[in-house]
Amino acid sequence: MMLVFQIALLVLVLYSLLLVVAVPVLYSSASDWSRAKNVILVGSLLWVLMVIGVGVLSFLK
């Protein structure tokens, strides 16, 4: 179970780093704002679910 938690935490950290780069780039691109808005929304929701999942795994370990 500890390995699953560590992998989930690593994925969360890497995804967070990806969002740190991707979100400002998407905000700065003026073209196709509706698509960028949807990508940011889905990416943020996925991040929240990952944080909750890591929290649950942390509680279970």
UniProtKB/Swiss-Prot annotation:
Q: What quaternary arrangement does the UniProt entry report?
A: PSII is composed of 1 copy each of membrane proteins PsbA, PsbB, PsbC, PsbD, PsbE, PsbF, PsbH, PsbI, PsbJ, PsbK, PsbL, PsbM, PsbT, PsbX, PsbY, PsbZ, Psb30/Ycf12, peripheral proteins PsbO, CyanoQ (PsbQ), PsbU, PsbV and a large number of cofactors. It forms dimeric complexes.
- Tell me the function of this protein: May control the interaction of photosystem II (PSII) cores with the light-harvesting antenna, regulates electron flow through the 2 photosystem reaction centers. PSII is a light-driven water plastoquinone oxidoreductase, using light energy to abstract electrons from H(2)O, generating a proton gradient subsequently used for ATP formation.
Pfam families linked: Ycf9
Q: Which organism is it from?
A: Synechococcus sp. (strain JA-2-3B'a(2-13)) (Cyanobacteria bacterium Yellowstone B-Prime)
Instruction: Write the protein's name.
Output: Photosystem II reaction center protein Z
Does this UniProt record's set of keywords contain Nucleotide-binding?
no
Phylogenetic classification of the source organism: Bacteria, Bacillati, Cyanobacteriota, Cyanophyceae, Synechococcales
Swiss-Prot/TrEMBL keywords: Membrane, Photosynthesis, Photosystem II, Reaction center, Thylakoid, Transmembrane, Transmembrane helix
> Which Gene3D superfamilies does the entry mention?
Photosystem II PsbZ, reaction centre
- Per the record's keyword annotation, is Membrane included, yes or no? yes
User: Cross-referenced SUPFAM superfamilies, in alphabetical order?
Assistant: PsbZ-like
Q: Name the predominant localization.
A: membrane
